[in-house]
């Protein structure tokens, strides 16, 4: 999403703003987890001017074609997606950013990926679907 906005904030600043807007759950020990979609969508719409569409109960083969230039899909997947050979992966609990989907191929940023594939991993739609939880957020840049 680099280049979508002129606003530049550090990760620390982004996290503080997201916590102020109840976008995450903060545990008593201070750990942060669990992106809460609706407050997050409202925040990035107001703060950055992005348009968001909630995706729920939708298989990735139906939601991925919506990703076009100027859009990205924040998709809920299992963290095990970094190892596509995982036999029986769980679904959900981790987020990736799909930045391209065409011809049955998904290209995505995976923050928990290995160094060789974290920035831009590629999987077939069928393999990606095994890890996908059927939910996410379609984010569009300002028109």
PLM region spans:
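Loop/turn elements at helix/coil->beta-strand transitions in domains of secreted/extracellular proteins
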Residues: 50, 69-72
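A short, well-structured beta->alpha microelement
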Residues: 55-61
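Structural recognition of the beta-strand scaffold that forms the well-ordered cores
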Residues: 53-54, 73-76
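Short coil/loop residues immediately preceding or within conserved phosphate-binding loops
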Residues: 93
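Surface-exposed ligand/attachment interfaces on beta-rich extracellular proteins
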Residues: 61-67
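Noncatalytic regulatory segments and standalone regulatory/sensor domains
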Residues: 23, 27-28, 33, 68, ...
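Cysteine-nucleophile protease catalytic domains, especially the papain-like/related folds used
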Residues: 1-55
């Amino acid at each position: 999403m680099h280049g979508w906005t002129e606003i530049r904030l550090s990760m620390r600043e982004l996290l503080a703003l997201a916590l102020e807007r109840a976008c995450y759950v903060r545990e008593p020990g201070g750990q942060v987890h669990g992106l809460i979609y609706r407050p997050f969508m409202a925040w990035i719409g107001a703060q950055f001017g992005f348009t968001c569409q909630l995706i729920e109960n939708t298989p990735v083969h139906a939601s991925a074609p919506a990703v076009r230039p100027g859009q990205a899909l924040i998709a809920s997947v299992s963290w095990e997606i970094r190892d596509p050979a995982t036999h029986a992966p769980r679904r959900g609990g981790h987020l990736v950013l799909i930045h391209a989907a065409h011809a049955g191929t998904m290209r995505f940023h995976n923050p928990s990926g290995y160094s060789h594939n974290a920035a831009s991993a590629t999987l077939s739609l069928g393999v990606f679907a095994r890890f996908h939880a059927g939910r996410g957020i379609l984010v569009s840049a300002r028109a």
